[in-house]
Each structure stands twice: as C-alpha cells, then as structure tokens.
Amino acid sequence: TQILFVGDPFQLAPVGHGAPLRDLLAAGVPNGDLKEVRRNAGSIVRGCAAIKAGDRPTLADRFDLDADDPINLRLLESHDALDSVEQVLLAMSRFDPVWQTQILCAVNEKSDLSRAAVNERFQKLLNPEGRRVPGIPFACGDKVICTSNSTLSAVEFGAGDETDAGRYQPTGGESFVANGDIGKVKAISSTGIILEFGERLVRVPKSKPKAKADEGSEGDIVSGAMGDFELGYGITGHKSQGSQWPCVIVLADKSGGSVADRNWWYTTISRAEKACLIVGDRSAFEQQVRRETLTRRKTFLTEL
C-alpha cells in the first residue's frame, strides 16, 4: 500500500497536538517540493517568501493591481481597524465586498477585532435589509460558514415567497456540507433556514432531529443543524486554511499574540488571489510575523 500526503508544512499546525508534516519530513520520508505558484503573484508571493525565510515582508502603502508585477500586499495602519475596514468595504468597486472578500481574524472572541465582533458589525453593514424571523440568528442574504461536517436534506423551491423556508420542498436526497464551506442564507422560517451552496440548496433545521425509538433506528440521516453554522463575514485564520478569495483583509490584532505567529501570517496572507490588505496595529504585525511556535512543538512521531 502506498500513501501520498499533500500539504504545506509551513502552514498552521493542527489545532490539537502534533506537527505531522514537519515530523514526516524530519524522519526522512521521500518528498518533493512544488515550486510553481498558481494562486497568486506579485508582492503577495514575495511577502510570503520573506515570512517563510524568517524576514519581515515589504508592505506597500498603496495597491497597483494592474501592474505586470502587481503591488497587492498592503498594510493600512489604524487605531480603529473595524472603522477602517468599513470604509474600505464601502468604497470597494473591484471586488464584491461580501462574496469576493474575506475578513480574517486571529481569535473567536474576547477582542475588539475578534470573529464575533467582526460578524456583529458587518452583518449590519453588509446585509441591513435581510428578512428576519424572531429566534433565528441569521437573515436572508447572510454569508455563513459551516463549522462541522453535516449531511443535510436537499431541497428545491416550490412556489410563492423565495425568502420563506416553508416554500422549499425536499428532493428526496441528501447533500454533504463540509466544515469550512461558505454559503448564503436563501430563505428563513421559525423552524430553520435554507442555505445555498453554489447550485445546491439544503435545509438546515433549527435543532438536530431526535433519534427514533422504534425499529432500532439511530434517527434521520440528517446530521446538521443551525448550531453547526455561524456568520461568515469574518472567520479565523485557522478556519481559512485550505480556502482562497480574490481579496483578503487580515486584522492585525494585539490580542491575537497567542495565535498569530509566523505560520499564521504566512497562511492568512497566502489565502489572497489578487489583493491582501492588512489592517490594524503595525507593531503587532511586526512582532507576530517573526515569532515561531511550530518549531517548539514537542512530538515523538520521528522516534516511532
């Protein structure tokens, strides 16, 4: 049996224990290194290379995205980062501020620049008129992210009000939604929401179905519920790993020091295809981008 592992050992380590890619390389497992960059170009690539080498990247004070060698990595120093991000989003013309742009945060909560703070603010800014129902935290049109692998009922629109989740009928099939998938709230009701993932529509119940007591059944095949989804205007850098967007806004947060290190910044900046804007405290960025934590993880895989 042959096994092929694909990954970047310089990106974020597992949230829990271990550093498997680092240890496999250290153990001398045969490996290759891909050199051609496909996702991005310009100063994003040079900045990531500098971070990887342990150097401080060069950050521009302006963008030039149309140049042959685009200037597409910029730092906007700000004492009120969310105010600055709001101004950027309202003035944005090249990229859709919701679906082509992603805000990345260091921490989930307990910071003015946390994921919770970002989503509370930018839901109001970017989706002020979305239809709401009491008891449901989302509104029609909201950007949401899946936080746990889920199997959900596939649905199709019947007739009537497209924003009413009760107007959607099951197709008889199921649809798998992976942890990290980003979708749009298409319809809403007191019992749940309809989410759109590309051409797929799924029903997300307000609560998980209860197991059936008869016939030894373990319950419905549906495994997801609204608790497995969160607003997605802002997500953490860890949740962003493996994804990409045309424009990425990364918040330089002094409160993110325990999370935002050299590997975190390398990962978040490299999520951007066309433009990456860092907003916030310059000194926090400069300290964090040179701090190493992955190399200090104590593991024993190489000794096995």
Give residue ranges: language-model regions.
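Conserved helicase motor core of P-loop NTPases
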Residues: T1, V6-A178, K184-K186
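C-terminal accessory regions
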Residues: T171-G172, N179-L304
